[in-house]
Amino acid sequence: MKRITWLSSADAPDWFPDPESALDEPPGLLAAGGDLTPQRLLAAYRRGIFPWYSPGQPVLWWSPDPREVLFPAEFRRSRSLDKAMRNRGVTVTFDCDFAAVVDACAAPRDAAGGTWITPEMRAAYVALHALELAHSVEARRDGELIGGLYGVALGGIFFGESMFARARDASKIALAVLVENCAARDIHLIDCQLASAHL
């Protein structure tokens, strides 16, 4: 029977168990504990591992298989998205307001008011952004932030963390512009981590 590994503060920040040892149920759960230092986060991403947990839980580390990925070279916009990008008056920028994008992604989206982006998680990704390793894409209309996403770029891969939309198709437009700019940024794969009907 597989069991998750507990990471302690005594463990080297770049040590993780083999992703092959991740649980089947819940799918991909690999380890618990540790911290969200840049060193540990980067070590995790290099092995296809990411943190995802709720307030009150220890840091939970995941490596699901299969996982959702996009190949920018194979990306084709749908007609409806192409029309939305032409007609909605949306301007897309990169790394212009990282903290605002994370805060918008962290805003509760359901009646229960839950979010997985804890203050510690926010601080960790802001620290990665300061190191120019975490990046945001902002979609604005008339200067107002209406959608966007953020993630980590490492080794030719963009690891998408979260996205939000305050207007129809705004996050999809941000994602499409990211994908279309991947070649210029030396990104060959986008790891969406978990399958989503939104993509």
Predicted regions and their residues:
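N-acyltransferase acceptor-side catalytic subdomain
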Residues: 1-198
